[in-house]
Each structure stands twice: as structure tokens, then as C-alpha cells.
Amino acid sequence: HTDVPVPQAIALCTDDEIIGSMFYVMEHLDGRIFWDPAVPEVNNAQRTAIYDEMNRVLAALHSVSVEGVGLSDYGKPGNYYARQIGRWTKQYRASETELDPDMEALIEWLPDHIPEGEESVALVHGDYRLDNMIFHPTEPRIIGILDWELSTLGDPLADLAYQLMAWQFPREGGIAGLAGL
């Protein structure tokens, strides 16, 4: 048991014939999911509390003893950034329909700019953002983190960076970023 709020898993199906891949069923949580990172449906104090709660839960996630909960072999510790760059480059190449010079430049630039030094290793979510959280119906309290398919052992700073990415994206062209707010 940890302080990380997750929906309880009810069943796992490993038969690919059912829906084309493995899947699991989890409990239903009655709560709120905020799709827009500006959280326009709440006031400023509530918005601050929501983001404070995200930070609190992220710290709890990264404080989990992977050995203590039996996850020491959950992923490959070390080289997290290189593994992620390789994974996303392969996925991009598999779905690429035309050459994008900006993406090509990024794919070339990233491997040469991986942070130097020893990476911290923790349980990371891999997709830690506001709309992957279920909040209590009336309180700014996370009752469940969703979408764990990218979770692994890796550098916890990557989760923090992913969470903060919304602050860098503009709020235009269908992107719900927070830059300039």
C-alpha cells in the first residue's frame, strides 16, 4: 500500500482475442476530470489547490519504495531519457506521413542534449498531466491517477517536466496551453 491514489484493479484479461490486446477493468471513481489546464470552472484559490495537490501526489509517487512494493524489476533503471527518445522516435517514424523538418531537427538534437550525470530512479507515470487525474467531486483532492501504460522506472524529473509542459504551450489553435495566462 502507498499514498498514491489509484483506482482498484478488478480483473486482468491477457487474451488478445477479446479486444485485440490485453486489458484490465478497474473500479469506477465518482469525481471530476479537468480537461483544460486553465481549469476555468473553478476560482483562483481552487485552481491553486488543484495544482498543489498534483504536486503533492507526484512527490508521493516518486517517494514510493519500488523494492518495498515489489516493482524493482518493473522497468530498466538507467538511460531513461535515451530509452524514451528512442521509443518516441520509433513511434513517430511508424506514423510519419510526410517529412517534417522541425521533427527531423528535434530527433537529431535530443540525443545530443540528454542531461549529463547520474539519473535518479523512481516509479514514473510517463503521462502525468491534469486530465489523467480524477479529483474528488467537491474537494481539490486527487482520488485516482489514470493511464499508467507509460509508467516505468525512470527519472522523476521527466514527470515534473511533462506536468509543466502546459505552461509552455500557447493557448491557440486547439491547444489548451497556459503560456501567456
List the predicted regions and their residue ranges.
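ATP-binding pocket architecture of kinase catalytic cores
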Residues: 1-123, 136-140
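Conserved protein kinase catalytic core
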Residues: 17, 33, 133, 142, ...
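Residues that scaffold the ATP/ADP-binding catalytic core of kinase and kinase-like folds
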Residues: 36-37, 145, 163
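ASCE P-loop NTPase motor core, strongest for the SF2 helicase catalytic module
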Residues: 117, 135, 153, 163-166
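Catalytic-loop of the protein kinase fold
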Residues: 123-125, 130
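Activation of the activation-loop gatekeeper triad in protein kinase-fold domains
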Residues: 146-151
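Active-site activation/catalytic loop segments of kinase-like enzymes and analogous catalytic loops
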Residues: 158-181
